[in-house]
């Protein structure tokens, strides 16, 4: 992803992104993947982990009805992600969670409890402030306080941004 590439360019050691849409060994909806990542965390192989949970699985912009299997897959992905976040935090690994600023994900009780318990910093920014043609307000919540320097609000003239529209569908089953 872009964040991984940016970290690599400034000389930080990075791992290949673990992605829901990747090969099965990198699919967070699989218990074996989660167990492996937990073992790496406990072994001290990570200093920081970023979680960008697909917002299309739980989007307020989508009006399509989800099947029971799709809902179960979404819940499994969220449960596994929260388990990994808690594992990282309990082993001294900095954590960053990224999602659109208006996402209802930020209102999930388990995430709110984690954020309070570990004193996360909230960082809001507009993508246009980092060279994107669209505004797209984003939010990071992080235990890495230095990331607060990324906070930016849009200062562009009105109507200059590309309009993001349409409906993106992402398979949530892994």
Q: Where in this protein do the model-derived segments appear?
A:
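Conserved active-site and SAM-binding loop architecture
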Residues: 1-174
